[in-house]
């Protein structure tokens, strides 16, 4: 069971934070149709309970996959989900963030380190990608030569936005729009 809701609702503050981070990390993998292994769920629970640290969780996941000889395509996807989830969990509980292009590429590198050789690199080629959430249609992505400027523009627009002038619904709407636009500018390779 992947539901960490019990920790989020009833847990001590540290367990709540870790539970929320794991649930978010695993949920982000689900957006791409990826499912974590039962081993990751067990490891996440140990981390939440304080039985192991995030460093130990990361090492356990790494060792788990190093011990596997051959991988089917499904196992490769599970490996991606487990490794990225562990990396995202670590990032979400850190108290730092650089709202810059360098900061975003650093996040990409840290999430996909050990999964993709191009982790943290801005793509230098044009892409199309069939999205299951769009029933197989593709998003129109920004052309590779224009990516850096497009992302820098988006970040600058976001920096200038005054969050104090919108209510909660306006805030959610604004963030959703920013994420949507940023996604269509997708700076980094993902597959």
Show where each model-derived region lies.
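Conserved small/polar residues in nucleotide/adenosyl-binding loops
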Residues: 184-190
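Helix-hairpin-helix/helix-loop-helix acidic hairpins
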Residues: 137-182
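A glycine-rich, hydrophobic loop/mini-helix early in the fold
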Residues: 111-155
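N-terminal structured helix/loop subdomain that forms the ligand-binding/catalytic interface
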Residues: 1-124
